[in-house]
Structure formats: structure tokens, C-alpha cells
Amino acid sequence: GCGKCAALCPQGAVDASTFDVDRSKCTRCGVCASKCYANAKKMAGRKVTLREMMDLIEKDRIFYTNSGGGVTIGGGESTAQHEFVEELLKACRASHIHTAIETCGYGKWDDIKGVFDNTDQVFFDLKAIDTRLHRDLTGAGSELILKNAENAVRNGNEIVFRIPLVPGYNDGR
């Protein structure tokens, strides 16, 4: 690669030798993607307003009503945009639309609590309980995630814990 993305990143989130992006620094500003002549870096998705999102959701209201379903916010990570997601969940609740989020639970509880306060159901992904194994698999320990799982239980959320079993890694073998 040419390295332009690393040189231009205002957060210093792009490693100049590997061109990997440090997601903890990246603000998703798009500078790296907009200046990449080879189109090796691209922005996925688009910005929408709360009203635009609710208009899209309302188009499927009959489906939610007939199926007993609702809106599930996944991603990447639903809590990565916690302010917007919290407002979206509040709007869905005000419109009597059932909501669920999918999360790995990584984030400061003070930041993400509002998301948990305003959703009906949580699909909580636990990659590994053991913090060393979790660090090996994901690059981060499990302490914060387990604490947030505990916080979500105390918060009274309806939770489905999901653990992906990867043969040879976290399947107990």
C-alpha cells in the first residue's frame, strides 16, 4: 500500500506498516477511505437521521404486528453508536415496537446503560469466559464484558446469552 491512509488519519488509527485499523482510536470519519486511490479501504453504510430510520422501520410495521417480532439492532456492535441507538430504541418504544439488541457487551457501562434501559431483549455474545482465552481470541480480556453482563442482569434485561463454539479454541477440548 501507499501509506496515505496512515499519514492522513487524524486519530492515528491506521498502522503505517500493516495498514490495520485500531478500532479503539478510529472515529469512522472516512478520511482513509476517501483518499485511498486503490479503493482498498471503503466506508460501509451511510449516515441516517433518527426520522429516516423510523420511517424505514414503520414501513415494516405490519410484518412486526403479524409475526410478533420487532426491530433487532445488530451491527458490528450495536453499542458502538450508543447515543443514536438509545434514541432509536426510545422512538421504537414510543411507537410500541418490540426491540432487541445484539452486543458483545464491550464498553463503559455509563455509556451503554441507556441502550440496555431502552431495549426489550438482549442477545449477549460471550466469546470466552476465561480472560486469557478471550484476549487470545479477540485482543481484549473478558473482565469488562463479564461485568457488563452482570450489570445487564441486574438491570432486569431479558437476556439470551450466546456462546459461539469454535472447535479447538473454546469448546473445552
Language-model segments: residues:
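Conserved AdoMet/S-adenosylmethionine-binding subsite of the radical SAM
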Residues: 51-54, 58-173
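Short Cys/His-rich zinc-binding micro-motifs
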Residues: 1, 25-26
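Non-ligating segments of multi-cofactor redox enzymes
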Residues: 1-3, 60
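Iron-sulfur cluster-binding cysteine motifs and their immediate structural context
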Residues: 4-21, 31-46
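Intrinsic structural disorder
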Residues: 1, 12-14, 126, 148
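FAD-binding FR-type
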Residues: 24-25, 46-52
